[in-house]
Amino acid sequence: MQILLANPRGFCAGVDRAISIVENALAIYGAPIYVRHEVVHNRYVVDSLRKRGAIFIEQISEVPDGAILIFSAHGVSQAVRNEAKSRDLTVFDATCPLVTKVHMEVARASRRGEESILIGHAGHPEVEGTMGQYSNPEGGMYLVESPEDVWTLNVKNEDKLSFMTQTTLSVDDTSDVIDALRSRFPKIVGPRKDDICYATTNRQEAVRALAEQADVVLVVGSKNSSNSNRLAELAQRMGRRAFLIDDAADIQEAWVKEAVCVGVTAGASAPDILVQNVIARLREFGGGEAVTLEGREENIVFEVPKELRVDVREVE
């Protein structure tokens, strides 16, 4: 059985930054550090940080006065930000800079009183945070997930309308929704390209190349990870058996028993140690040496806040 690895896969710059913010805060200030929502959607990462003293909460009211609070990589609404500001808290923002860029687009539309449409998945924390940047009662903020949603949407003024997208969507699905928006609202204005981030786009491109060669695809990522789910869906659409797994223990031998080639990738919030564990498990099932496919090089780095720019090893 051949083992192929998608390239790129795993951590993106926004996830790296968010985890570093929590790790550095723990090293500098000591436990406990409070984090609103899971800092990234990965069980292994969250459990590891929890063991070191991070406390994950959903409501600001759960944070005691004088504590350190970190916003997750998914971002928060303006209401949450204001609530935190009204409290005696030291706040660090781990929102991915590419999510912040979308927040700024929404805030700009809100100031102008222009209506905005967000393409995204209802209930996802990134969507809640992005929708929460809009506050102008003269305009309006709407969420659509599919072309069908677009055709049933009613707005106040079709001449002053813009759209944005969640950063972790399916590139293909989003293109279909944008086509519907432009057809329904010919004067709608959007970003030069959609707001789907480079890492999401690159990992979908990589899993497409992987699925062309593999007959089974394993996606390492947690069930609540939007970008990981999109990778598994894409492989399935290409006619491959694809499974979303948290770690190597989830793999069932029956999935790969008849496989000639198994492809492995990982969502943007999944650490490489989980991929290595999956490779080891596949080798127990008769897999050979893992071969990494050629792919797009990524060299983007997002800096942590200057107050947290320390060598954690020195602090420890």
UniProtKB/Swiss-Prot annotation:
Tagged with keyword NAD: no
Q: In which pathway does it act?
A: Isoprenoid biosynthesis; dimethylallyl diphosphate biosynthesis; dimethylallyl diphosphate from (2E)-4-hydroxy-3-methylbutenyl diphosphate: step 1/1; Isoprenoid biosynthesis; isopentenyl diphosphate biosynthesis via DXP pathway; isopentenyl diphosphate from 1-deoxy-D-xylulose 5-phosphate: step 6/6
Q: Which residues bind dimethylallyl diphosphate?
A: 41, 74, 124, 225-227, 269
Q: Where does (2E)-4-hydroxy-3-methylbut-2-enyl diphosphate bind?
A: 41, 74, 124, 167, 225-227, 269
Reaction equation(s) it catalyzes? isopentenyl diphosphate + 2 oxidized [2Fe-2S]-[ferredoxin] + H2O = (2E)-4-hydroxy-3-methylbut-2-enyl diphosphate + 2 reduced [2Fe-2S]-[ferredoxin] + 2 H(+); dimethylallyl diphosphate + 2 oxidized [2Fe-2S]-[ferredoxin] + H2O = (2E)-4-hydroxy-3-methylbut-2-enyl diphosphate + 2 reduced [2Fe-2S]-[ferredoxin] + 2 H(+)
- GO biological process terms held by the UniProt record: dimethylallyl diphosphate biosynthetic process; isopentenyl diphosphate biosynthetic process, methylerythritol 4-phosphate pathway; terpenoid biosynthetic process
Name the domain of life. Answer: Bacteria
Q: What is its EC number?
A: 1.17.7.4
GO MF terms here are: 4 iron, 4 sulfur cluster binding; 4-hydroxy-3-methylbut-2-enyl diphosphate reductase activity; metal ion binding
Q: Pfam families, per this entry?
A: LYTB
**Cofactor stoichiometry and binding remark:** Binds 1 [4Fe-4S] cluster per subunit.
Positions of isopentenyl diphosphate binding:
41, 74, 124, 225-227, 269
* Cofactor(s) required for function per UniProt: [4Fe-4S] cluster
Q: Where does [4Fe-4S] cluster bind?
A: 12, 96, 197
CDD domains in UniProt = lytB_ispH
The record's note on quaternary structure and interaction partners says:
Homodimer.
Q: Which family, according to the similarity comment?
A: Belongs to the IspH family.
> What does the protein in this record do?
Catalyzes the conversion of 1-hydroxy-2-methyl-2-(E)-butenyl 4-diphosphate (HMBPP) into a mixture of isopentenyl diphosphate (IPP) and dimethylallyl diphosphate (DMAPP). Acts in the terminal step of the DOXP/MEP pathway for isoprenoid precursor biosynthesis.
* Protein name listed in UniProt: 4-hydroxy-3-methylbut-2-enyl diphosphate reductase
Q: What is the species listed in this Swiss-Prot or TrEMBL entry? A: Salmonella arizonae (strain ATCC BAA-731 / CDC346-86 / RSK2980)
Name of the coding gene: ispH
